[in-house]
């Protein structure tokens, strides 16, 4: 059971997890854990499932997925009958009015839909994940000199579950450098898995780029792959002018994570998100929603 904070009704909700029985079995049973290490965490497994999700045959999953998880298709640019395959549906674009972006340059917005955690006064040797698991920022970035620039800064971890909108966006005007790709495995990023596999973010396939934002300084913008995420697709054009709310890229099928790192004294995160993070609870947000402000 995954409990998260709903800031709209100021109460806790229970997340409806896609493939919950499979996740619990895989990460809780000896046989499941053996399969995970031998097969499921490998790129080959995610490529096989990704291949299926790109085929027309996978269309039969779409309507059941929509009904099971109550996905509001009135927000989508296309309706279910127009998608060519499950991945086409999964990476769907939303109508612009579905995710309005406030122009106020002082407002910090969420880069995507999902559940967010925030950590300030970043300790480079120990960043806390869901369920209290720690990992090293140095190991995550694999660049010690760059990591040191973010000492005592702020970290935002946005977890996208399979039922979420899976495109991620820029949070400010600016210019983004080329993407750096780091090889890794494909463990799930669901809290069920995070509690069983230490330092998942450091072990999984991930990509990051430096975003030179106009109002929040230089931001490390990282995407982390997960089980069945065959691809992290970057759609932005590096080293060109970017506007707040522009699409940066998207994940193909699976749960995934976006992580942002800010330098010291550049942003202030909303109190409800910070307080819930301290308690160990994620907060649900949508792309474009204000989550903080410029210092």
Curated annotation (Swiss-Prot):
GO cellular component: plasma membrane
Highest taxon in the source lineage: Bacteria
Positions of transmembrane segments: none
UniProt subcellular location: Cell membrane
Entry's EC annotation: 4.1.1.65
NCBIfam families per record: PRK00723.1, PS_decarb
Function: Catalyzes the formation of phosphatidylethanolamine (PtdEtn) from phosphatidylserine (PtdSer).
Protein name: Phosphatidylserine decarboxylase proenzyme
Species this protein is from: Clostridium botulinum (strain 657 / Type Ba4)
Source organism phylogeny: Bacteria, Bacillati, Bacillota, Clostridia, Eubacteriales
Name of encoding gene: psd
């Amino acid at each position: 059971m995954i409990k998260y904070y709903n800031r709209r009704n100021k109460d806790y909700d229970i997340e409806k997890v896609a493939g919950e029985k499979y996740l619990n079995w895989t990460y809780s049973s000896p046989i499941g854990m053996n399969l995970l290490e031998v097969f499921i965490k490998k790129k080959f497994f995610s490529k096989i499932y990704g291949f299926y999700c790109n085929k027309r045959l996978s269309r039969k999953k779409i309507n059941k997925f929509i009904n099971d998880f109550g996905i509001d298709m009135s927000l989508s640019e296309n309706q279910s009958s127009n998608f060519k395959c499950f991945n086409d549906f999964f990476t769907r674009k939303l109508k612009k009015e579905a995710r309005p972006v406030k122009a106020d340059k002082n407002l910090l917005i969420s880069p995507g839909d999902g559940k967010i955690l925030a950590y300030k006064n970043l300790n480079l040797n120990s960043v806390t994940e869901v369920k209290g698991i720690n990992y090293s920022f140095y190991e995550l970035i694999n660049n010690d000199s760059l990591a040191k620039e973010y000492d005592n800064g702020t970290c935002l971890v946005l977890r996208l579950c399979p039922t979420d909108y899976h495109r991620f966006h820029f949070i400010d005007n600016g210019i983004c450098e080329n993407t750096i790709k780091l090889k890794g495995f494909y463990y799930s990023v669901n809290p069920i898995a995070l509690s069983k596999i230490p330092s998942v973010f450091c072990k999984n396939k991930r990509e990051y780029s430096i975003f030179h934002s106009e109002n929040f300084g230089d931001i490390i913008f990282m995407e982390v792959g997960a089980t069945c995420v065959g691809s992290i697709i970057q759609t932005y054009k590096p080293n060109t002018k970017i506007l707040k709310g522009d699409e940066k890229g998207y994940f193909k099928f699976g749960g995934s994570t976006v992580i942002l790192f800010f330098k010291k004294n550049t942003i202030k995160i909303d109190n409800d998100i910070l307080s819930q993070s301290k308690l160990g609870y994620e907060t649900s947000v949508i792309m474009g929603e204000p989550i903080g402000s410029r210092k």
